[in-house]
Regions:
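Conserved hydrophobic positions within beta-strands
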Residues: 56-58, 95-97, 162
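Conserved active-site neighborhood of the chymotrypsin/trypsin-like protease fold
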Residues: 42-46, 51-53, 63-147, 171-174, ...
Length: 311
């Protein structure tokens, strides 16, 4: 297979031949860390089901159907999943349409909406170099470190740097970075300094339960439970090029925005606020999830009217 600028030849073309759009601007705007966070906020979704909690990124749209890239382990069990978008609206996922990519921890799920949501720009992940600054966006699950036990969720946006790459990818995971992450952020996007998705987060080092038990005087059960919530070491992402190369094998043909230009230096460093932004906060997740049923009921009523009064 031939490669052009690090992208496999099958991916370089038009929406007619490959259903993938390659955008190669000559100049990439330098953004501040806060501007990258604004982009991350709009493209990051929460994915939740009765037995699972994770994140994802909106990568494409076709009519009223949106496509979300996430880690497969977030949606590995057949269940009733919902997506929560940046405006805190929930939508049901049709699990029968979930696409798993072969040999890696990636999946594409879809939801339907009349609303306009921002679509992520992707970037040739061969541009990722050791030492480059990256950001991770995602929704930590209830009970994660720093989350309110009463049902409040806060989207996390953390900065760090690429520290290296695994010689032998594990489930597709290859990119290593220093960003702090928490359970529930799996499937969330890793962004470069231009706000483009360069990878999908999904694996991280965790605290050793025996060391935690000895240090804190905890019971073995408590130590094991808490250890899973603490990620003191490096974290790992599947590079976006892995998705681009494998998508056709899973029947995933989407109009994607893929750029091939290097990331610029950050215009201004990201500094987290003392308090969470209200746009990144869900006070009552159950109330938000109930909005999915209202959306379905509204769509059903519209379809009944159309069948009765065709126009």
């Amino acid at each position: 297979m031939k490669f052009y600028g690090g992208l496999p030849a099958i991916l370089v073309g038009t929406a007619i031949t490959s259903a993938i759009v390659i955008v190669q601007p000559s100049v990439v705007m330098a953004l501040s860390g806060e501007q990258v966070n604004d982009i991350a906020r709009e493209i990051t979704v929460l994915i939740t089901g009765p037995n699972s909690f994770g994140s994802g990124a909106i990568i494409a749209k076709d009519g009223k159907t949106y496509y979300v890239l996430t880690a497969h382990h977030v949606v590995s069990r057949k269940d009733d999943y919902k997506v929560v978008t940046s405006d805190k609206q929930a939508y049901k996922i049709d699990y029968s349409k979930m696409k798993r990519l072969p040999g890696v921890d990636l999946a594409v799920v879809e939801f339907t909406s009349d609303k306009d949501y921002k679509i992520a720009k992707l970037v040739n992940s061969d541009q990722a170099k050791q030492g480059k600054e990256v950001f991770v966006s995602g929704w930590p699950s209830l009970g994660s470190v720093g989350q309110d036990a009463g049902g409040q969720l806060i989207r996390q946006f953390t900065n760090g740097r690429i520290s290296g790459f695994l010689e032998q990818p594990l489930g597709g995971y290859k990119m290593i970075y220093t960003n702090v992450t928490r359970p529930g952020m799996s499937g969330g996007p890793v962004l470069d300094t231009a706000g483009r998705v360069i990878g999908i987060h999904g694996m991280g080092d965790t605290e050793d339960p025996e060391r935690l038990r000895a240090r804190e005087g905890l019971t073995p059960e408590a130590a094991r439970s808490i250890a899973g919530l603490i990620k003191p070491g490096f974290n790992y992402a599947i590079p976006i090029n892995t998705f681009l190369q494998l998508a056709p094998q899973s029947g995933v043909y989407l109009a994607l925005q893929v750029e091939n230009s290097p990331a610029p230096e950050l215009g201004a460093a990201y500094v987290a606020g003392a308090k969470p932004d209200s746009r990144d906060q869900i006070d009552d997740i159950n109330s938000v999830l109930n909005t999915a049923d209202r959306v379905v009921n509204t769509i059903d009523r519209i379809e009944r009217v159309r069948r009765r009064f065709p126009f």
